[in-house]
């Protein structure tokens, strides 16, 4: 018995790709625009409901195509309103996505890979190793699935998602070919229509890919720094051995020079590890290292996970660290932890690739006092 033909998942196309596909099947490109409105603005995945497409086209699409996002395996709500979604992929793997509501926004923390290859020692995701990259449909499908589950609205003030942070499982710059089209859809007015300042990509420092990113799309940038010197960063963020701090920061400055989304500043993420990177001397060193890179700094209280060798810095140590940075005129925010009672806080996202006791999620990243980030 012959295998069932694989259907084309329309979530894998950004607007340019969808127009090209419609042209290839003999349809006018404007049909792609209509399709995008149905999928992303109306949340419709059933071609029969797309009533402004003629019946012949609907039948053709049903035979050849599908609109398929990852399914919800389970979801958990936290006491602060945060919801963690475990989404099941083709092949049975799972990734976790976190929705963080706040008074004036709702942020979604999105994964780019199953697992992560970067081996950051303080991150639970890194302990599971790397499995595979997510496809465009699996990345934008996280946004679509959560948005349609929470409830789409034509009222911009009631949007289920106002901000997206690429801070979930994985290193986004190691999956650039799928992350960029997915972010295109986040920004596209026919899809989710988010401002480029409300879509943030976080990287641990894949410098060549960062240069490529700047040539392909303009979104807000956050960097996972976590150490003020190469010796320590080599230990806790091993990609630093390939792209040391000064090389990384030079790449950041090149990106900022091309970008309007960042308003001239990068967000520097720094997880506070007790007795490791949180001394006042290290704060002085960090301020000096960042002197030539316009930035705002998010200090992230470490979120422990089972088997972690680290502990969280005390509030008093974090406050002292922040005051030293502020004395240099740097903008400093101590990130507010969200969703930690459901393992949905920064550094706790793992998914289903490994033992569930290692599960990890990430936190919130915002331009003010709240942030979501899943450490790489």
UniProtKB/Swiss-Prot annotation:
Keywords: 4Fe-4S, Cytoplasm, Disulfide bond, Iron, Iron-sulfur, Metal-binding, Methyltransferase, rRNA processing, S-adenosyl-L-methionine, Transferase, tRNA processing. GO terms for molecular function: 4 iron, 4 sulfur cluster binding; metal ion binding; rRNA (adenine(2503)-C2-)-methyltransferase activity; rRNA binding; tRNA (adenine(37)-C2)-methyltransferase activity; tRNA binding. Its cofactor is [4Fe-4S] cluster. [4Fe-4S] cluster binds at residues 116, 120, 123. Disulfide bonds join 109-346. The active site is at residues 96, 346. Its EC number is 2.1.1.192. It is found in: Cytoplasm. GO terms for biological process: rRNA base methylation; tRNA methylation. Signal peptide: none annotated. It is an enzyme of class 2 (transferase). S-adenosyl-L-methionine binds at residues 170-171, 202, 224-226, 303. It catalyses: adenosine(2503) in 23S rRNA + 2 reduced [2Fe-2S]-[ferredoxin] + 2 S-adenosyl-L-methionine = 2-methyladenosine(2503) in 23S rRNA + 5'-deoxyadenosine + L-methionine + 2 oxidized [2Fe-2S]-[ferredoxin] + S-adenosyl-L-homocysteine; adenosine(37) in tRNA + 2 reduced [2Fe-2S]-[ferredoxin] + 2 S-adenosyl-L-methionine = 2-methyladenosine(37) in tRNA + 5'-deoxyadenosine + L-methionine + 2 oxidized [2Fe-2S]-[ferredoxin] + S-adenosyl-L-homocysteine. Its main location: cytoplasm. InterPro entries: Aldolase_TIM, Methyltransferase_A, RlmN_N, RNA_MTrfase_RlmN, rRNA_lsu_MTrfase_RlmN/Cfr, rSAM. Specifically methylates position 2 of adenine 2503 in 23S rRNA and position 2 of adenine 37 in tRNAs. m2A2503 modification seems to play a crucial role in the proofreading step occurring at the peptidyl transferase center and thus would serve to optimize ribosomal fidelity. Belongs to the radical SAM superfamily. RlmN family. This is Dual-specificity RNA methyltransferase RlmN. It comes from Pseudoalteromonas atlantica (strain T6c / ATCC BAA-1087). The lineage of its organism: Bacteria, Pseudomonadati, Pseudomonadota, Gammaproteobacteria, Alteromonadales.
